[in-house]
Amino acid sequence: MDLENNTLPGRSKMMTAIRCFANKIRSFYMLNIRYSGVYWGGVRTLVRVPLSTSIWSPHKDVTVGDRVQFGPHCRIQCDIKFGNSILMAADVAFVGKDDHITNIAGKTIWNSGRGDSQKTFVGNDVWIGHGAIIIAGVKIGDGAIVAAGSVVTKDVEPCTIVGGNPAKFIKNRFETLEEKEKHLQYLKMLYP
């Protein structure tokens, strides 16, 4: 770690080194002990997982790429694949779409069982705002931004900003198509 460039004003290099070490211990616990069934991307993986994060997958199919940061109290309750360079704020939830079968006459919801859960995909360079809810089975494209409090029920196009309930297109992340293409090419080069 480059302590020279990662030290905040007023914080000593020693405190930054101690925080970095504590972060590595917490991440080791979360990645190797608490969620040992999750595939964490590889040898050079930098993943930040607070202790308050909860991961449960119906088919134990969770993959997390490199440079992924979960905010406090994030909930993952579906099969999912995370790309690389993802930021998630606090209270982000990935929830199952077909958790309970509700349309069988003569059976209670309790006795009807569960439906098939679809896999969710989160691309590279994605930012998901505070309290967003992502319904299982959607694909969030590379470079997308999901606004705080959004409920994402449909796929999110690459390099777009969505928000609301249900989430709708707000605007493009980049002003021109050339900028968008340049960024997507950069991501393809960075994460082949």
Identify the role of each PLM range.
Residues 99-100, 150-151, 157:
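Flexible glycine-rich beta->alpha loop in the catalytic core of nucleotide-sugar glycosyltransferases
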